[in-house]
């Protein structure tokens, strides 16, 4: 073949490749803009046919993907990834929960608290926005590229659902920003529009599949699918409203953040005409907004259950700080929940982990806010007596906070039959037949038998919970079965379970048994705070567990603490101190803790940063380690180290496991030291 021909042919191929690559970039941009116009602005500028032609051209070019950047291509939204399970992911900054209010009066009280804390009489400027009824989500952009999406989870650790979130067409895979920040965490809500939800349920019904109770359940269920093709087939939406961690950008107000999102392709409510987001000066304007949104709520294309009020100034937010897990500078003003009328068919009593007997009304099924309700809590005997609720009554029920069903009132109680007698909680525990006791000054009747089968089951369920020991493969049904088969009666029994014992149960296969044993094994390194919370001591919640861990530092010191010493712990009063001491003063319960330690449970106390062997050092993990990534992070933090979210000049060590990503190359370029899991352990 002549050299000249070869040169001409090669030159032509190179030119064609260059043109294809250029056209590919053009198509990505054009299609992404049309996606934004259609799915975010609801203002399509081309026909469906024209859009399909552009998409077909894109797919045709991508048949030969060599040299093409597919990471932000619209073709990546069609789904196809199928995961074996979800991986846990830690938020760089906690996703805090908000305090709730339910009336305009509460808004005035919130404003008064804010001004009092700031020591000012001047009106405070608030950003008022919608409280979406969806699934909270954090999108993480690195250098403008969407790299990860994490559910809220417990506020500290969520689940990585990137494979599904990338299928949502309103979410940009790449920010429309010429110089994107190195890191931008966008927080918002995944939801489903009412009209889309109705169509989805019609399709589900036509296909003989289970329908969803409401748009929120549909959105949450879709996001948690392991197969991203399912998510891609369902009409999910996203609205951004808050920041997580950010590098390379500064903001002065909450409104600035929303405007920034809107300007760079992240969906917000700003394009809507109904003034869904406003800046209000003083509580009067906030209340005006509250009533406005309450009025337009039925017309909105999506569900909301209230409004969120935030101090607009980020500097003032910093001054106000936090209270436990909630910011002082924000509150959620809920709307009155939807109600319905039904009949109380029976009243049954459930026994909780502290022995509390809780009456529950079994009702004729009725839909409230799109959800079929069949039972509602009656709280306690005083509540039943106050409302005079009897079996057979017609009642008004509502979903408190649009979630938990409760009985509001009895309809026409004066017209009920004479033989319909008042209801009284039984004097004996329905689970173990022990005498039930109502202590002086309390409204709750309790079973005081520590061996009550119901108390044991509920205590064990609490022990394995996500925020406690986090034994995620052991669910409520399995605990019921294990207890009924006398394989589980106390906490330490979890660590005595064998694969053979699990296989002896119905519907338990080899893989399932392996997963259960592995899950139990993985729970053996809890923090002291989690372990204390898991014990289920009355009045000791998650936050109190953290205070106790920070104060006593070791499990031994906690178990030995006197009431006087317990009273020195922040936010612990006489009642809580006595409850803790009653528990730690019981030799059988203390022996149970010792038994768990002997069975391999290693309880890690909090380490002061200056005391840790890794103090002052920053770490990032990439690839698969011999242990769970969250456990590795806990190990680093317990020894004073700090976890960073991305490779930067601030990073000291990149811990590399199997199949590492592109972070290794970036770290090498910045001169960051790269170490193995074994080298990290040696440093500790």
From Swiss-Prot:
Reaction equations catalysed: NAD(+) + (deoxyribonucleotide)n-3'-hydroxyl + 5'-phospho-(deoxyribonucleotide)m = (deoxyribonucleotide)n+m + AMP + beta-nicotinamide D-nucleotide
Gene3D superfamilies: 5' to 3' exonuclease, C-terminal subdomain, 6.20.10.30, BRCT domain, DNA ligase/mRNA capping enzyme, Helix hairpin bin, Nucleic acid-binding proteins
GO biological process, one term: DNA replication
Keywords from the named record: DNA damage, DNA repair, DNA replication, Ligase, Magnesium, Manganese, Metal-binding, NAD, Zinc
Catalytic EC class: ligase
GO terms for MF: DNA binding; DNA ligase (NAD+) activity; metal ion binding
A GO CC annotation given for this chain: cytosol
Required co-factors: Mg(2+); Mn(2+)
Pfam families: BRCT, DNA_ligase_aden, DNA_ligase_OB, DNA_ligase_ZBD, HHH_2
NCBIfam families (alphabetical): dnlj, PRK07956.1
Protein name stated in the entry: DNA ligase
Gene name tied to this protein: ligA
